[in-house]
């Protein structure tokens, strides 16, 4: 986030509070159980280095989107996806698809990215990303695509995903108002 805001334009500054609000809560840093469960690290040192590098690039692109530079964020994330997919590290694919969904202006594209993010997150036990993706899927189907029945079907899955991460109150509120 620092990298994007180092050269921020007026639009980015206006959206900086929203971008800061999108960061995971600080209390998660103290939750030892949450930090040690779930996602397995990459199997080799070389893969870990590659995943860290790509994760950094995904985070920069995601921050661009949060700062209002959606077109640039979408272009960067679309260009990154083949490299992310090539790692075959599903937690990273889930994170990248979630970021790509956030930078997608077309409802169908956003939903497709969220569905893939959910699948990759669930299969790799990346519960926080799965919960976030499920909540966004409810929002995207209910408001963006007018798929109300499918949105209602996704509510139960989103609720279960939130429970797996100890009932995150912020996600719970977003689900309740979706």
PLM regions and their residue ranges:
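Hydrophobic or amphipathic alpha-helical targeting/insertion segments
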Residues: 3, 119, 126-139, 147-153
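Tandem amphipathic alpha-helical repeat scaffolds
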Residues: 22-24, 54-68, 95-107, 132-147, ...
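Amphipathic alpha-helical segments of tetratricopeptide repeats
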Residues: 78-86, 115-123, 156-164
